[in-house]
Amino acid sequence: MQYTFPNYYKEFSCIAGACPDTCCAGWQIVIDDQTLKKYQHFKGPFRNRLHNDIDWKEHVFRQYNRRCAFLNEENLCDIYTEAGPEMFCRTCRNYPRHIEEFEGLREISLSLSCPEAARILLSQKEKVHFITKEKKTKEEVYDDFDYFLFTALMDTRDMLIDIIQDRAVPMQKRLWKLLAVAHDFQLCVNKNELFKWEEMRKRHEDSGYGDRFCNKIYSRINADNIENSSAASACANTPEQLFKKMWKTVVPEMEVLRPGWQEYLKNCLTPLYNGNTDPQSDSGNLYSWQKSEFDFSYPDWQIQEEQLLVYWIYTYFCGAVYDDEIFAKVKMAVVCTLFIHELNVGTYLKNNRQFKLDDQIRICYQFSRELEHSDLNLNRFEELMSEKEIFSFENLLKIC
């Protein structure tokens, strides 16, 4: 069995009571079968509490006011204190370690939803790289595992990460290339022409970011603008208006995990969008200027944006071996990162043009919790990338 993890993985150590939040609230923690059996046979004074606060039908810990039943007033776990750490379920034992499973391979990451893991990721200045180690385990076989597609995904992911980490190229062009590669990869899979992808991928690799590549992108954007050539349509397709539509598409579809999340989004985004509801008004210049001002005032974002993109691509891209949704996963990586940037700028404006690493950490882990702590949200977000025209290839090129 091979195990892959990012180079900063072993820097993590839980900071317990010093953590600004708790990992035991706002999501339902599923108990694995092995731990469930241990709970069934547990003896001692804690037995009744253990049995009463587990939903045995759903295999989850009960919640009270969105908090795990075993989370006490000091934000510590009563299972840990009363029964010992060996009684943790797999999720609680592993978190914030996240594991993606493939035949003969486990890919481990630190979840962005953990404040300390977010701090470690966002503090990385060097390009992240990944370490693979081998461990002798029983051989496993996954039924219907498409190893040909998986190999293509792995090779392409390496290419995508190289694109993201090419600091000699402006981020806008890196994002364009990222989307273009994923778009063409998806076309090959849709046409059952995966055998052509290696040659196409090599062409993408060789084409670089020169005039030919940029002209193709501009022609794609311009063709879409001509198609929507009325004044109202043109104004509605500015980056500001596109982002507004994207938020309005995503937010109502998401399960709210923590009370106040939607209010938080409104408070963050209103200063950026200036409360302007008229798509034909001249607010675009102010919007662009505010974003440029933030980027100048908080230069760390340049590298943090890169680290976030690598995080999303590393964690989710190769999962397309199970559902073929290659382009949707790359779209999700881009949209999530750009959504975080919008929240950054709104927070910067709301806080009288002040923004620190702590603000960045808070935005990232709160955003991640609402998305990654719910399979429903994660799956729906990805579905929206494929289903809704607002997330078309052309629209994403415009907001990069």
Spans of model-derived segments:
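Short, compositionally biased low-complexity segments
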Residues: 11-18, 127-132, 236, 312
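Short, charged/polar micro-motifs that form catalytic or ligand-binding hotspots
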Residues: 14, 82, 146, 150, ...
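Hydrophobic, aromatic-lined core segments that form the binding pocket/scaffold
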Residues: 171-400
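Internal, well-ordered alpha/beta segment that forms a basic, Gly-enriched binding/recognition surface
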Residues: 83-187
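Membrane helical hairpin/interfacial module
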Residues: 27-74
